[in-house]
Amino acid sequence: MAVGLFWNERVSFEKHEWAKRFFFLGNNTGNLVFIRALKDIFHPVMIPLWDVTSDTFRDRADITHYITTELIWLTPNQTYPHVWTMLKRIGDKPLVPISVGVQSMARNVDITLHPDTVKLLRTMAERAVLGVRGEYTAAALGGDGL
């Protein structure tokens, strides 16, 4: 059994000295620490996010679940067609969204998500638990029945 993680490795840290590693971390603390934690917990098969061909992972019968972090920044009227593409490519296997987060500068829980985004989240919720970031996101998504 294996887990697939949709992610593009952008930097190989091992080739840089410590000062440069801290520089990278400071520019993207949350995502870098977050991805490292997912790697340590699941030891996933890394799947290129933007350059995925069907033969990259469709035939991986050992992958039972897929993980995405692409929904950490949900904004009004935004759609996520690349996440739909992930769902299409993995068939009926679960795509687990880690740290789903609604973003509103006014912190308004009555935020209006694009209908396609609501449909996407409902489709994902049929296969996996939606891991949301905090009470604000839970309340905002609850307004859409999620």
Feature-to-residue mapping (PLM):
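Aromatic- and Gly/Pro-rich donor/ligand-binding loops
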Residues: M1-V129, E135-L146
